[in-house]
A protein has these predicted regions:
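S-adenosyl-L-methionine
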Residues: 1-61, 69-78, 97-125
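Conserved SAM/SAH-binding beta-strand->alpha-helix loop
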Residues: 89
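A short glycine-rich, Lys/Arg-flanked "PGG" loop and its adjoining helix->strand segment in the class I
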Residues: 149-163
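Conserved beta-strand/loop positions that form the S-adenosyl-L-methionine
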Residues: 61-63, 86
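Class I S-adenosyl-L-methionine
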Residues: 178, 182, 186-233
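Conserved glycine-rich SAM-binding loop
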Residues: 66
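Conserved beta-strand signature within the Rossmann-like core of class I S-adenosyl-L-methionine
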Residues: 163-171
Length: 233
């Protein structure tokens, strides 16, 4: 475990930014009112594949899934695996619920709120994958403690991933990329960076769909970077 200063996302205990945007369409509100209660992560208790799905399965955890394209793609690709997606933004949750309905994804559970609240309730060594795709970069230096890639969260990721489990990160912000590489370098006793050549972090690996945000980033001339780390142990 790496010593970390108070003030990173594991100790701030608050979310920054909006939790909702434009008013939901009626069809979206219907999904929030009717489908979300059926598939949301309970507010209390241990969170496991068994507690959520009734049987043990490889468990995936996505932090800040945006509109849910990646979450839905992976869940559809791996129907015998279990997926938890966390997103505080109501409009993103509503869009993701549409993917769950349209793709008929019984292997997805959703948490509208702070991902770390749920992550703490998952037993150590229970996760096969953690995804953090295009997190808020918090570009100002004084806001660096708000970045999800910080020593506290990375220690938490390490405790929840099983040996051989994988942490996947995507960002189009060069500052966030360099910051993440620096933080992860402090955790080489917990994680192995899987890149062997520069191409390995310039293109997504197999089974990794480009989201709308990623496509927008490319159109606007920004290059997404893809990092994969394996849990050592």
């Amino acid at each position: 475990m790496t010593a970390h200063k108070p003030g990173d996302p594991t100790t701030i205990n608050r979310l920054y930014g909006r939790s909702s945007g434009h008013k939901l369409r009626k069809s979206q509100q219907d999904l929030v009112d009717n489908l979300l209660p059926q598939i949301e992560v309970p507010e209390e208790g241990e969170v496991t594949a068994v507690s959520l799905f009734g049987e043990d399965r490889p468990l995936h955890f996505e932090i800040g899934f945006g509109a849910g394209e990646h979450l839905a793609f992976r869940a559809d690709l791996l129907p015998d695996h279990a997926f938890i997606g966390c997103e505080p933004f109501l409009n993103g949750v509503a869009t993701a619920l549409g993917h769950v309905r349209d793709k008929h994804l019984p292997n997805v559970r959703i948490w509208k709120g702070d991902a770390l609240e749920v992550l703490r309730r998952i037993p150590d060594g229970a996760l096969s994958f953690i995804y953090l795709l295009h997190p808020d970069p918090w570009p100002k230096a004084r806001h660096a403690k708000r970045r999800m890639v910080n020593d506290g969260p990375i220690d938490l990721f390490a405790s929840k991933l099983k040996p051989g489990g994988e942490f996947r990160l995507a960002t189009d912000d060069p500052t966030y990329l360099n910051w993440s590489l620096m933080i992860m370098q402090r955790h080489t006793g917990q994680f192995e960076w899987l890149a062997k050549t520069p191409k390995d972090f310039l293109e997504p690996s197999g089974g990794w769909i480009e989201t709308r945000y990623g496509a927008k980033s490319r159109r606007e001339g920004r290059r997404p970077y893809y990092l994969r780390y394996r849990r050592i142990g």
